[in-house]
């Protein structure tokens, strides 16, 4: 046995490089001077090699080190609610949540509002990578080294270069033990002394995979005949957050992944780069990948002896902290690059198509959105100041990007609803004026007449205003009992109360008209009680009537019997569904052929007894079953959607938010989609879908409510108020990051110019400036309450809490005031139409007065 051991030892000595010297110190008992509490710490730190693969080591504590778990008091419901509300509004006392909000805000600001102050840039940017030395890859002396470890040599760990501290110290009685991050191959103490390391520097967090990227990967897997799950298994290790401790997490979650190496074969290198681009080092640059693919195949060095000079030169080909850094051309000519290869145990086979997959990943990858410097900030060249406090800088770095779920859902709904509306209701005449159609139509008098139909043109390439009202547009007469519309309907019913059936002498037909409209020479106006056919009611002849094809004496359903006799007022008569006699009643108003029935025309509840041909030409709603206009409810027909609870009182208040998902046409929808995929999507990445959804919907509802007050007879659709509420978020974000911007006034005036331009654009027809103004004001209040912010000290933190409460109360007051003006004290503004549409011509703007819409 001893002979075999000597043979194996001699074979190992022959394979040992001549320059390699191993000095293994002998084990020595712990000295008396060494503190006893440091022994477990030292065993834990130096239990395994920090440069060679090792199995997961589980340290078993002695029985005297076992401690009872600390008993904690259960958090009360009140404290839980308070803590959750503080975290949601971004004013919690927890440093982690506060830094998370504020770092994301700074990152967003740097992309949107221009250049930052120089001090911010110096504290946000990492140190220069030009001065990288080999000493940064060497392991420093450990925190505590006993006599037995004083002879240990330094071990080179190339991947440890630039690895910053990811967690703070775990202090125990005044001494700290650093947590070594477990890399894909091994761990190294170089992680704690690199020239780029520091407790004050937190790593940039990786952006979550976009929906488009995941969809592209799934489609590629299906085209190749692979399962979608196979492609996602290799990415199960990737996280969208920084774990509290890399050592504890990797040891617990991935116990079988420590038997790997830093270096792999060329076929697996791209897989390693695509699997660990964010947790070990940044994604490789495109130029470096091209150099790697163009490099000639070299001899395989697997299992061979390693030369010291080659080992020291090979670190130049290894990934640095941010991507791959190429060696200078002069140095490359003197020292050829040598790839270091080593055997890797991999459960997955070699993957093909990596030369296409890596550029595709780089195509979909995007940097995080700095607070205050989003898309608009890039367009306006905003930058941070040169110097920013480190506390503010940490707040910027801690902010993560959210997935814009609300933006994608909203865009899908807008597109789908617009397509369905255009397909079902068609496209109105395109233009800015009014479109007139003239035709010869048979009317209720039995003769053809030339009639004209006037329709407002729609330059958005979409349905007409009547169709949009039927779909759910903002329209005050459908949301409340409008005083003018109600008085107009009552006046029409009063005229109908004194009408009677006009029977033509040639027996060509009859129609319900007034005495002025019935010819005394060509027809007979059957008016009760003058006409002998008048029935009796309670022993007296009826004073109002007659009605063509309706009489209480011959109607069976509903019958006019005591105590349910039909009233004296004919406008209160029900619709007769069944008559007891046919056309031979010996009553002239019952035996004639009726030529006109009620037709609801227009959008203001106007009813006219006319022929079906004329009703269809005027795009009205013809009622074949009724004989009087009082028997139909035209506003219910015009508004559509759900029927009113009381047919006389419109109550479709849900139009305030339903109209946010409608558009006036295809162009209108495209404009909204462009806005949502740029500004709204950018802001949702910063604040999350729940905050943006609240601001978007409440701003739109407030804008529509103000528009319904000042422009009650105008059908409006689209998220105009919501979009201006989102624009108000940009102003609030600018105000919150004012102290860190290099030129905040320039960014402010640029934003102001954009808003003024959009407000001027709102002077065109079909664009509501009242919704713009109210949506912007409400969005301003809501943004101060719900958007994330950057705090500049404890006093500023308390000020933000007061600010949240104050602006929520102000918004609720604004909303309550608008509700009172709409339902309780309605107002009428004569000049308000000039604020939303300037009549350059007589027919440029649609008339807002009630009488102008009556045909």
Swiss-Prot record:
Residues 25-35 have a biased composition (Low complexity). The modification Phosphoserine is found at residues 76, 176, 390. Keywords: Endoplasmic reticulum, Glycoprotein, Golgi apparatus, Growth factor binding, Membrane, Phosphoprotein, Protein transport, Transmembrane, Transmembrane helix, Transport. The keyword Nucleus does not apply. Residues 1-35 are annotated as: Disordered. GO terms for molecular function: growth factor binding; serine-type endopeptidase activity. One of its GO terms (cellular component) is endoplasmic reticulum membrane. Residues 1-411, 677-691, 736-746, 794-803 are cytoplasmic. The chain crosses the membrane at residues 412-432, 656-676, 692-712, 715-735, 747-767, 773-793, 804-824. Belongs to the peptidase S54 family. Homodimer, or homooligomer. Interacts with TGFA and HBEGF. Interacts with EGF; may retain EGF in the endoplasmic reticulum and regulates its degradation through the endoplasmic reticulum-associated degradation (ERAD). Interacts (via cytoplasmic N-terminus) with FRMD8/iTAP; this interaction leads to mutual protein stabilization. Interacts with ADAM17/TACE. This is Inactive rhomboid protein 1.
